[in-house]
Swiss-Prot record:
Gene: kdpA
UniProt xrefs under Pfam families: KdpA
Transmembrane spans: 3-23, 64-84, 133-153, 179-199, 255-275, 281-301, 375-395, 421-441, 497-517, 535-555
Membrane topology recorded in Swiss-Prot or TrEMBL: Multi-pass membrane protein
Name of the protein described by the UniProt record: Potassium-transporting ATPase potassium-binding subunit
Compartments in which it is found: Cell inner membrane
Function (record text): Part of the high-affinity ATP-driven potassium transport (or Kdp) system, which catalyzes the hydrolysis of ATP coupled with the electrogenic transport of potassium into the cytoplasm. This subunit binds the periplasmic potassium ions and delivers the ions to the membrane domain of KdpB through an intramembrane tunnel.
Keyword Cell inner membrane: yes
Keyword hit for Transmembrane helix: yes
Molecular function terms from GO: P-type potassium transmembrane transporter activity; potassium ion binding
């Protein structure tokens, strides 16, 4: 037990130590171009020339958003065509067939929006070709899209008054060449050394200890797993994700993969401070997010290592903790840490089954995604926090009788309306779709039965499974309570719709706020200016997030994990 706690502490320490210098590097990449990866410039110039891009052309926020949305529409059709026809494409030694249109729609939308919700198993649902040219390609592009959006927001915040927020295509390319590619190579090298496969051979047939034969899937796993983690994508190469011994072979790879989930979102908060030359603001935001993250880690590690009281009543030894759904090579401590890390970001990868975690652990996992603000996905994590920051500035200004200002720009009704819509859209989507699915489950049992029955666990936990699915979809997370049978017409299409709304509405709103504030006249700070880089304001922002986001879900949480908790304890 002490060893497990030490492992958890070591991983958190690694994140804290490395996120600071990485944040400084990222700020240099977006601001000056005078970073240690500038030798990639010739490759970038080749890409610009090939695509007909002028990287020096400045865009206003509307042109920036137009470029962002256009490329995403293109990749959607690219992915749909390849996924449906993958059975006829090369690099398919196992003879896997194409996906059905509804599954391809869900898969394509899911990976295009950085969610990676998987209603299929990678071993049989994809080929090596689509793993590389749809899944891995999307994982780089969607991560870089979020980072490019944040780079545009940082540029707008840094300027005193400007009509432009940078060039989307330039930010997209350098996010890949100078941040995501190099880090993926390092992580991939470690995985290969530790035993993760990297090749294009078909399934292996091996004899088991009992004398039977077993087929084991392989493929270019080590190429895909690094960006799965670093890009907060989370879509597993294998069906059981990083629980699979070839996707996550050892405790070392577990540390590296778990570290990879959070390192860029953490570093981007520091990058904000360096870019704006307001390091104290970065520290305050980092502190608020870190506090919420550590609170979740403490809760989940405690409950998973304490075990299940119902199993205690049966007289079964639980000295190793609650081991249901856990890998024995990793243990409940490492699984609990991963469960918080993957839900506090938009990653969604797993090294154990979230459906088997204790009720309050499941509640923490859902709350992280329902709040969707603590570090979050690469780029979009701060952007979600940004909307609450605007609300907190406005409320704080009214409370103390000062003009609501953020970085020298007045926050007025227009920005507040957009921030409010962005903040309330998330709970609206989750709760409305959960209500619809619950209604269908109760009042259309024949339809539910025709789709396989949906739930393996009725009652409190069954409701939690449906709530978790839409929470995960709306938070662009992709993890799931896998007791839910979700590869059906109903779940593929409703989750796909939730994915689209929850990805693009916030990005459009947040970039619009940044563009509107950038156009405003800069007002120098004075004695009457509300300070946003203080601990007091950080606490205020934390409680605004808790009140607006977390409390919106309290009734639903009461019907699910909280009720389940009281049925066990």
């Amino acid at each position: 037990m002490n060893t497990e706690i030490l492992g958890v502490a070591l991983q958190i320490l690694l994140l804290l130590v490395i996120s600071y210098p990485l944040g400084k590097h990222i700020a240099k990449v977006y601001k000056e171009g005078n970073d240690c990866m500038r030798f990639m410039a010739p490759i970038e110039r080749f890409i610009y020339k090939l695509a007909g891009i002028n990287p020096n052309e400045e865009m206003d926020w509307k042109a920036f958003l137009k470029s962002l949305l256009i490329i995403n529409v293109f990749w959607f059709f690219w992915g749909m065509i390849l996924l449906v026809s993958q059975g006829y494409l090369p690099l398919n030694p196992d003879g896997n067939s194409g996906q059905s249109p509804d599954l391809a729609f869900n898969t394509c939308i899911s990976f295009m929006v950085n969610c990676n919700l998987q209603h299929y198993s990678g071993e049989s649902g994809l080929t090596y070709f689509t793993q590389l040219f749809v899944i891995m390609l999307f994982q780089f592009i969607t991560a870089a899209t979020g980072m490019a959006a944040m780079a545009g927001i940082m540029k707008s915040m840094a300027a005193k008054t400007t009509k432009t927020i940078g060039n989307f295509w330039h930010y997209l390319v350098i996010s890949c060449t100078r941040i995501l590619f190099p880090m993926s190579l390092i992580v991939g090298f470690i995985l290969i050394i530790q035993g993760t496969p990297m090749g294009f051979d078909s399934k292996m047939t091996i004899p088991t200890l009992e004398g039977a034969e077993q087929t084991v899937s392989q493929g270019p796993t080590a190429a895909i797993v690094p960006i799965k983690q670093l890009g907060t994508n989370g879509g597993g190469y294998f069906g059981v994700n990083s629980s699979h011994p070839l996707e996550n072979p050892t405790y070392l790879t577990n540390i590296v993969e778990c570290w990879s989930i959070l390192i860029i979102p953490m570093a981007l908060v520091f990058a904000l401070g360096f870019y704006l030359k307001r390091k104290k603001l970065g520290y305050v935001i980092y502190g608020v997010m870190l506090f919420a993250y550590l609170l979740g880690v403490f809760c989940n590690v405690h409950y998973e290592m304490a075990g299940n009281p119902k199993i205690d009543e049966m007289g079964i030894d639980q000295s190793c903790g609650a081991m249901e759904g856990k890998e024995t090579r990793l243990g409940p401590g490492a699984t609990a840490l991963w469960s918080v890390t993957t839900t506090v970001t938009s990653n969604g990868s797993v090294n154990g089954m979230h459906d088997s975690t204790m009720p309050l652990s499941g509640m923490v996992e859902m709350l992280n995604m329902q709040i969707n603000t603590w570090f979050g996905g690469v780029g979009v994590g701060f952007m979600n926090y940004y909307a609450f920051l605007i609300i907190a500035v406005f409320i704080s200004g009214l409370m103390v009788g000062r003009t609501p200002e953020f970085l020298g720009k007045k926050v007025e009704a227009r920005e507040m309306k957009i921030a409010t819509i962005v903040s309330l859209a998330h709970p609206f989507v989750i709760l409305i779709f959960t209500a619809i699915s619950s209604y269908v489950w109760v009042y259309a049992p024949e339809f539910v039965e025709s789709e396989g029955g949906w739930l393996n666990n009725p009652g409190f936990h069954g409701f939690s499974e449906m709530l978790y699915e839409y929470t995960s979809s709306s938070a662009n997370n992709g993890s799931g309570f896998e007791g839910l049978g979700d590869n059906t017409y109903f779940w593929n299409y409703t989750c796909g719709l939730a994915l689209i709304i929850s990805r693009y509405l916030p990005i459009v709103g947040q970039v619009a706020i940044a563009g509107l504030l950038a156009n405003k006249k800069y007002t120098p700070e004075s004695a009457g200016t509300l300070k946003t880089d203080t601990v007091t304001f950080g606490v205020m922002t934390f409680f605004v997030i808790v009140i607006v986001a977390a409390l919106s879900f309290f009734p639903a949480q009461t019907l699910g994990p909280i009720a389940e908790y009281f049925s066990i304890y």
